Structure formats: structure tokens, C-alpha cells
Amino acid sequence: MDLSQLTPRRPYLLRAFYEWLLDNQLTPHLVVDVTLPGVQVPMEYARDGQIVLNIAPRAVGNLELANDEVRFNARFGGIPRQVSVPLAAVLAIYARENGAGTMFEPEAAYDEDTSIMNDEEASADNETVMSVIDGDKPDHDDDTHPDDEPPQPPRGGRPALRVVK
């Protein structure tokens, strides 16, 4: 059987590396190409056409590593969101602690899927890029990043205790 007739390896390798990283008490992260069609991620956290997503069990809910896409729920800046990433957009999986993992090589099946999805999106009028899960909306738009340090509490002199009888 010709290699082009086989199903893509990426979903199987992704699941294997994910389990291996967890078995070794490491934190799995996905590198995603946000420029490909069908990617639903919080674009405000993307840099240079990519986003890195923590997919550790403590960071996400309802994680599905399916054969066609990765789906999960997560909070970004306190806002619950649903993330969906086609496997063609998954570039790598690695451990935050030591970089162990792999980059995925291009596969012909994903090149065909991407061209089909580009054609479909060109004919679509309107598509939601990112949706809020439970209707929560931020009260204000701020430019904070998840890696920023938390704000320092105000300094107001000595703390005071009082006796309550």
C-alpha cells in the first residue's frame, strides 16, 4: 500500500506523546498555526501566527484528541472558552519543563484538507472565530497577558488588629 493511501500519523503520534509526557509528570503544550482555516483559539494570545496551548489535565476540561481535531474548554484571562484546532494546524507537542516532545512533519492528507477548507471558507459568508462558552463577557478590555505578575496590594502602613468583645 502506498504511503499516500494511509491515514495521517499525526493524531496517533499526538496521543502517544501526550500520554508519555503525562506519565513522566511533565506539562504538555501544543504549538498551533493560527493562520490555517478552522482554528478556533483566543487570537489575542497568538504571536507571529502561532499560539502555545497548555493541554495538561489541570489546565483544560473535556479534552478530546480526535483523529481530525483537538477540542477542549479552558479559561483565558478568566474567561471560559471553547478551543478547536484541526490536526493540520498542530505543529508540535512538547513539555514546558524540558522541551521534550516532537515537531510534526507535513503530511499530504493535511495539505489536501487545508485546500478544501480554504475553498469552503471562501464561500462562507460569516464564521465565528472564537466564542465565549457561558456568555460571560469581560467588563473591560485590558492588555494584560497570562504571564504577567499579579498586581501588588496597596501599601497602607502597618496592619492593625482590634479586640472585639
Swiss-Prot record:
Induction: By amino acid starvation. Residues 119-165 are annotated as: Disordered. Residues 128-165 are annotated as: Required for interaction with ClpX, not required for ssrA tag recognition or dimerization. Residues 134-143 have a biased composition (Basic and acidic residues). GO terms for biological process: positive regulation of ATP-dependent activity; positive regulation of protein catabolic process; positive regulation of proteolysis involved in protein catabolic process. InterPro entries: SspB, SspB-like_sf. Homodimer. Binds 1 ssrA-tag per monomer; if the first Asn residue of the ssrA tag is mutated to Ala, SspB no longer binds the protein or stimulates ClpX-ClpP degradation. Binds the N-terminus (residues 1-108) of RseA with and without sigma-E; although ssrA and the N-terminal fragment of RseA both bind to SspB competitively they bind in opposite directions in its peptide-binding groove. Enhances recognition of ssrA-tagged proteins by the ClpX-ClpP protease; the ssrA degradation tag (AANDENYALAA) is added trans-translationally to proteins that are stalled on the ribosome, freeing the ribosome and targeting stalled peptides for degradation. SspB activates the ATPase activity of ClpX. Seems to act in concert with SspA in the regulation of several proteins during exponential and stationary-phase growth. This is Stringent starvation protein B. It comes from Escherichia coli (strain K12).
